[in-house]
Amino acid sequence: MQNTKLLLTSFTFVGLLALAGCSFPGVYKIDIQQGNVVTQDMIDQLRPGMTRRQVRFIMGNALLTDTFHADRWDYLYSLQPGGGERQQERVSVIFNGNDQLVSLSGDFMPGVSRDEALLGKDSGTNVTAPAQEAEKPKSEVPAKPGSLLDTIQKDIDNVETVPVPTPEPLDTSPQ
């Protein structure tokens, strides 16, 4: 009886020690995204002099509009991958008294799209095409007079160029 009790206690103690050495499997954590997703393509579309409506159309509603600085909109985006470190991006858009875009600042690189930033400009893959002889340009043969090709060429030569109209600026005054 005494030996059985001692044996049972020792097996329990050894079992608990073995379990203490094992780690518990991690719990799955989802990615947490918050705020406005602002892509580099959106930033590239912004131009000085744009109205608030045009900026809102491109960027969406601002996450923060400062009550003390009504001419400033802040776009925040944060991503925390499950179990990873939180990453945050910020873009501030500033307007003048005429509600026109004056400047922007924040976490972006002009001219580099998000895809290029993630993938890199050079993927490291080199592809060489087989060498081919350069084609010699064919000499242009004039169309036969009265043929369909001659008629089309005459129509193209007689086309009048028309200047492209510039759009009127949007009226931003209250009605």
Swiss-Prot record:
Part of the Bam complex. Residues 1-21 form the signal peptide. PANTHER family: OUTER MEMBRANE PROTEIN ASSEMBLY FACTOR BAME. A lipid is attached at C22 (S-diacylglycerol cysteine). Keywords: Cell outer membrane, Lipoprotein, Membrane, Palmitate, Signal. Residues 117-147, 156-175 are annotated as: Disordered. GO terms for molecular function: protein-macromolecule adaptor activity. It is found in: Cell outer membrane. It holds the Pfam family BamE. It is a lipid-anchor. It comes from Pseudomonas fluorescens. Disulfide bonds: none annotated. Part of the outer membrane protein assembly complex, which is involved in assembly and insertion of beta-barrel proteins into the outer membrane. May have a structural role in maintaining the cell envelope integrity. Gene3D superfamilies: 3.30.1450.10. Belongs to the BamE family. This is Outer membrane protein assembly factor BamE. A lipid is attached at C22 (N-palmitoyl cysteine). One of its GO terms (biological process) is protein insertion into membrane. GO terms for cellular component: Bam protein complex.
